[in-house]
Amino acid sequence: MNYLVLSNSIRAAVVTWGKSLSVDLAPFGITVNSIITGFIDTEHLAHLNEQKSNNMNIPVSEILEGIKKSIPSNRLGKPSEMGQLATFLASDKASYITGTAIPIDGGFLRSI
């Protein structure tokens, strides 16, 4: 994602750290997973879009449409969708899922 240099830089490190931590904690029945978020409809994203709008001198609505067009599902994610995934991963139903990174991005990521 553009305009998120620091965030983008640490993402890979956090995912790798989570994987290593999951190996160390699995014998104790503790799971560790990462949620890789795409464009989620939050105040933070709105703020970033406003900054980009000011920098590029184009309407926020145009920026938002461009973002949506880049996502195969053609929409932003909802915070509740991210919360539901986190809730599932923290539940007993996900007790055998550990050391993984799960994208919640409407199909935005083009890699595995």
Language-model features, listed with the residues they occupy:
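Conserved SDR Rossmann-fold cofactor-binding beta-strand/turn motif
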Residues: 31-41, 90, 103-105
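Short, flexible catalytic-loop segment of classical short-chain dehydrogenase/reductase
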Residues: 37-47, 51
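Active-site helix of classical SDR
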Residues: 10-11, 18
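Active-site loop immediately N-terminal to the catalytic Tyr-X3-Lys motif
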Residues: 1-5, 27-28, 74, 92
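Short-chain dehydrogenase/reductase
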Residues: 18-19, 83-86, 90
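Short, small/polar-rich loop/turn modules that mediate ligand/substrate recognition or access, typified
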Residues: 26, 31, 97-99
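A conserved structural motif in NAD(P)-dependent oxidoreductases
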Residues: 56-59, 71-82, 93
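Short C-terminal tail/terminal secondary-structure segment
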Residues: 87, 98-112
